[in-house]
Amino acid sequence: MRLMLSLPVLVLVLAMVLEGPAPAQGTMDLDFTRHLKEFGNTMGDKAREVIDRIKQSDIPAKTRNWFSETFQKVKEKLKI
């Protein structure tokens, strides 16, 4: 029974895939692609700026020291 129901669905899906995209969806507006590329470049630049700021700040060192100190405190408490 399942096979009898799944075969027509499979044929329908295959026909839809082989038909291809609708004409309105087939062509992409070049202006849209240009805007999308500009957006990607802008986001990439902003991400690089944030990463550079994080690298130049002392937050990673402070975080590492805090974790080390906390880990040492936990080790000492568990030792007792």
Swiss-Prot record:
Q: Pfam families from the xrefs? A: ApoC-I (PF04691)
Keyword terms, alphabetized: Lipid transport, Secreted, Signal, Transport, VLDL
Annotated membrane-spanning segments are none
The keyword Secreted appears for this protein: yes
Q: Work out whether the entry's keyword set contains rRNA-binding.
A: no
Q: Where in the cell is it found?
A: Secreted
Coarse class of the primary localization is secreted
Any other comment in the entry? Apolipoprotein C-I is present in acidic (APOC1A) and basic (APOC1B) forms in P.paniscus, P.abelii and P.troglodytes and perhaps also in baboons and macaques. The two genes for ApoC-I arose through a duplication process that occurred after the divergence of New World monkeys from the human lineage. In human, the acidic form has become a pseudogene sometime between the divergence of bonobos and chimpanzees from the human lineage and the appearance of the Denisovans. Pseudogenization resulted when the codon for the penultimate amino acid in the signal sequence was changed to a stop codon.
Q: What is the protein's given name? A: Apolipoprotein C-I
Organism, per UniProt?
A: Otolemur garnettii (Small-eared galago)
Organism lineage reads as: Eukaryota, Metazoa, Chordata, Craniata, Vertebrata
Query: What would be the name of the gene that encodes this protein?
Result: APOC1
